[in-house]
Design a protein with these regions (language model features):
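Short acidic/polar alpha-helix capping motifs at helix-coil junctions
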Residues: 62, 103, 126-127
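Short, solvent-exposed beta-strand/turn patches at coil↔beta or beta↔helix junctions
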Residues: 46-50, 54-58, 62-97, 117-123
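Residue-level preference for alpha-helix termini and adjacent loops
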Residues: 1, 14, 75, 82, ...
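Periplasmic OmpA-like peptidoglycan-binding domain that tethers envelope proteins to the cell wall
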Residues: 115-185
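Periplasmic peptidoglycan-binding/anchoring modules of Gram-negative envelope and division proteins
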Residues: 80-113, 141-142, 177, 182-185
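Envelope-exposed proteins and targeting segments
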Residues: 65-74, 79, 106-108, 149, ...
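N-terminal targeting leaders that direct proteins to extracytoplasmic destinations
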Residues: 2-67
Length: 185
């Protein structure tokens, strides 16, 4: 028979689990980020099939074909796009990988995609995801010397959930780095 104490403990554990899981998300190593973003392209578009950056951002079919890596370890305060100094070691790892890629291939271009979970309105999640992507780009450029011309940003809000739930989910609150120079004119 369940007691109040047992039920309370179970409820507290259930509430704490997403936070514990988020805390356990680790930033991929710079080598892993490089390997993912420098892998052989999944598809090679002919020059006449290439698109504008704007069209690439709107076409999930093309985005799925691009080399990418999800970064779930950058933590933002609820409803905020500000990046705390405590997150800089994670961003430095990303910056190291991007700088090395750009040294080897000056034409490399990376899209920073911001994503949210489904909590909140569609409009607020859309705006927040855009702000977070811009915030990460700004930090990469200003604090870590990644060339800004190689980075584009976009926010998708709750449009592309990894975990299909309307509840809070740390896995859905992420940034995706997507290499897109193979797709644009």
């Amino acid at each position: 028979m369940l007691t109040r104490r047992t039920l309370a403990a179970a409820l507290i554990a259930a509430i704490a689990m997403p936070s514990l899981a988020a805390a356990q998300a680790t930033t991929p190593s710079a080598a892993t980020i490089e390997r993912k973003l420098e892998a052989a392209p999944r598809v090679k578009l002919r020059p006449n099939e290439r698109v504008t950056i704007r069209e690439f951002k709107r076409r999930p079919d093309l985005r799925r074909m691009a080399r990418s890596i999800d970064i779930q370890s950058i933590n933002f305060a609820f409803g905020s796009a500000a990046i705390a100094n405590s997150q800089y070691d994670k961003i430095e790892t990303i910056a190291d990988a991007l700088r090395r890629i750009l040294r080897r291939d000056r034409g490399a271009r990376v899209l920073i995609e911001g994503h949210t979970d489904a909590v909140g309105s569609f409009q607020s999640n859309q705006a927040l995801s855009e702000q977070r992507a811009v915030s990460l780009k700004r930090t990469l450029v200003r604090e870590f010397g990644v060339p800004g011309h190689a980075l584009e940003t976009v926010g998708y809000g709750e449009e592309f959930l990894l975990v299909q739930t309307q509840n809070e989910n740390w896995q859905n609150r992420r940034v995706t780095l997507r290499r897109f120079d193979d797709f644009i004119r």
